Amino acid sequence: MGFGDFTGLCRMAPLPLCSSVGPITSIASGVGIEPDCYARNIEVANTIIFQGAASAMHIIALVMTVVMILHVRGKFTAVGRKEITTFFYLYMLLTFLSLCVDAGVVPPGSAPYPYFVAVQAGLASATVTCLMINGFVGFQLYEDGTPLSLWMMRLCSAAAFVISFLVALATFKTWAGLGPTNTIGLFVVLYLLNAVQLFVYVVLQVLLVMRTLHDRWPLGDIAFGMFFFVAGQVILYAASAPICKAISHYLDGLFFATTCNLLAVMMVYKYWDSITKEDLEFSVGTRMNNWEVKDLLPEEDRRATVYHDDPYGQSTAYDNSYSPSPNRHSRY
């Protein structure tokens, strides 16, 4: 197997793009590489669903992503809130499209199938690029949540989507010198570039924690995220067929890879949540039970409050008019 050849990968793992690459076969009179083992189909209401277990995991991933987005949106003053939300939106869109492709909503061999797989490849690259750009937010090189920050992330993610989409479609349709048997370009943009971007993100976050935070616990979130992602890729590309045969085609590597990817994304959320905090004064209006009066002060103790430990630096309630600071706080 040469560099950029998908034959060995597709024999082991039931990837959606494998139906659109490889040499022309005499049996099917078309391109495609069939995996050695893949999960059995299930029938629900006279409808055949491919990859039943992986499809169910995609649905669970969609639900969990919605929960994470709601939690992120609830931290109104956290650093990088809008940027990390963009990442979760892209991941949710990628998961939904993967559900459609894996479950057979768009069946392999149909006319629109290559386009859907090309969009899936583009979304995968856009999601990884968005995550890498998120890695720079914590260094405060530019103000987070501003049009500069958001549009830079959107444009970079859009560029990654367009490049991967066009390369994948050109590979499937034999355009611009690419083709089902010339898959080097697709391999580079879909695997090498994405791997480099993930590596950059991890290095940036390790540097951020080591150089700017006193708490080292977020390194555990990074380590667990790396473990889950790498474990999913190893199972998918190195152990899918043996696992599938051992459990009688009930599951294959695609199910485990989908599960591990979800766990890795959850670790990204956990890491972001652990290094950011919300300014209480801006959130008290949305959380009704933050303050509860236990006992009223005696009449003789009702006097001006002294702010000895107040982070805003006022000495008494009468020194100057109080106005809440607009600055957001984080542990960076």
From Swiss-Prot:
Signal peptide from the UniProt entry: none
Any Pfam family the entry gives: Chs7
Alphabetically ordered keywords of this record: Cell wall biogenesis/degradation, Endoplasmic reticulum, Membrane, Protein transport, Transmembrane, Transmembrane helix, Transport
Region of interest: Disordered: 309-332
GO biological process, one term: protein folding
UniProt xrefs under InterPro entries: Chs7 (IPR022057)
Keyword rRNA processing: no
Stretches with biased composition (Polar residues): 313-332
Location in the cell: Endoplasmic reticulum membrane
Primary localization class, coarse: endoplasmic reticulum
Gene Ontology molecular functions: unfolded protein binding
A single cellular component GO annotation: endoplasmic reticulum membrane
PANTHER family recorded: CHITIN SYNTHASE EXPORT CHAPERONE
Subunit annotation: Interacts with CHS3.
Similarity comment: Belongs to the CHS7 family.
Record function comment: Chaperone required for the export of the chitin synthase CHS3 from the endoplasmic reticulum.
Record protein name field: Chitin synthase export chaperone
Organism: Chaetomium globosum (strain ATCC 6205 / CBS 148.51 / DSM 1962 / NBRC 6347 / NRRL 1970)
